[in-house]
From Swiss-Prot:
A molecular function (GO) term: endonuclease activity
Function text: Involved in cell division and chromosome segregation.
Name recorded for this polypeptide: Probable cell division protein WhiA
NCBIfam families: DNA_bind_WhiA
Protein family (similarity comment): Belongs to the WhiA family.
DNA-binding region: 278-311
InterPro entries: Homing_endonucl (IPR027434), Intein_endonuc_central (IPR004042), Sporu_reg_WhiA_N_dom (IPR018478), Sporulation_regulator_WhiA (IPR003802), Sporulation_regulator_WhiA_C (IPR023054), WhiA_LAGLIDADG_dom (IPR039518)
UniProt source species: Pelotomaculum thermopropionicum (strain DSM 13744 / JCM 10971 / SI)
A Gene Ontology BP annotation from the UniProt entry: regulation of sporulation
Length: 314
């Protein structure tokens, strides 16, 4: 099961403490996955579709707790591509439907369809958190923290996407909106922001798993950087030692090491004897002890002599 699916299953078990929070969450779920159906007799029903059984159960429970009305649940199995079940939670036409639509913010007081989210649904911060939870359950996903950090919510309405982005902004989340074919995507890319969003909507187990994976990933990346740095330094050291030996052998085989001043001859002989030694180790072998810069200076002088030989200047 993906990290996103595990997160949604956790959120499907989170119950809003107040009726106002449960109403806000249900309203968001209907905004994301629901539709109004009006029959020829002007009878109104609400259809909410999801592929997640836990979310379908939550929608059913929220409607029962809030309104105590008749609900229909239909299950259809897909036959093409993914063979997941599709769950239809339906509020059929019945007495008091107008009041239900009004409380959900789907119509105004005069019975006209309401496109925007009614402000009175989200007066409290707890209701705003519940609404965002419903939004994520209805159309959200989050990447595994082991990969690229990314959390998104997809909706077909640009105005609703902008509203979600603005609502996230009230919690100091720097969400952005982009277009993906016919869909509008509200997304977060920063790991800290994703962690905060999971905290806001009540996905605390997912948050802890995300943090653990993020820490492991950060440590692994840091170790890799250190290893790469050490490898690069080692390669430089090896390349330098090979160059130094080439210079020394050239001098030895042409004019002879005895032609060099004593300090240079001493370091040349040590380099031949200890080809894998570091500059510090070479310096420690000389009496009095020589610093790394001192050893490097002598080897550089040897290099200059070798270059003169290569260019024909004896």
């Amino acid at each position: 099961m993906s990290f996103s699916a595990v997160t949604k299953n956790e959120l499907a078990r989170v119950a809003g403490q107040r009726p106002c929070c449960r109403l806000a969450e249900l309203s968001a779920l209907i905004k994301m996955d629901g539709s109004l159906q009006i029959s020829a007799r002007q009878q109104v029903s609400i259809n909410i579709i999801t592929e997640n059984a836990a979310i379908a159960r939550k929608i059913f429970t929220l409607i029962k707790d809030l309104f105590g009305i008749n609900i229909e649940v239909l299950v259809k199995r897909k036959t093409r591509l993914r063979k997941n079940n599709v769950y239809l939670v339906r509020i059929p036409p019945q007495q008091g439907m107008g009041e239900i639509l009004n409380r959900l913010g789907m119509v105004d007081g005069a019975g006209r369809l309401e496109g925007a989210v009614r402000p009175d649904l989200l007066r409290r911060e707890c209701c705003r958190r519940a609404f965002l939870r419903g939004v994520f359950l209805g159309g959200g996903s989050v990447n595994s923290p082991e990969g690229t950090y990314h959390l998104e919510v997809i909706t077909g309405s640009e105005s609703f996407a902008r509203y979600i982005c603005k609502l996230m902004g009230r919690f100091r989340l720097a969400a952005r909106v982009s277009r993906r074919k016919k869909w509008h995507v509200v997304y977060l890319k920063e790991s800290d922001q994703i962690v905060e969003f999971l905290n806001i909507i009540g996905a605390h187990s997912a948050l802890l798993n995300f943090e653990n994976a993020r820490i492991y990933k950060d440590v692994r990346n840091q170790v890799n950087r250190l290893v790469n740095c050490e490898t690069a330094n080692l390669n430089k050291t090896v390349d330098a030692a090979v160059r130094q030996l080439e210079n020394i052998y050239l001098i030895r085989d042409t004019v002879g090491l005895a032609q060099m001043p004593e300090p240079l001859r001493e370091i040349a002989e040590l380099r031949i004897k200890y080809p894998d030694a570091s500059l510090k180790e070479l310096g420690d072998m000389i009496q009095p002890r020589l610093t790394k810069s001192g050893v490097n200076h002598r080897l550089r002088k040897i290099g200059e002599i070798a270059e003169k030989i290569r260019s024909g200047k004896k």
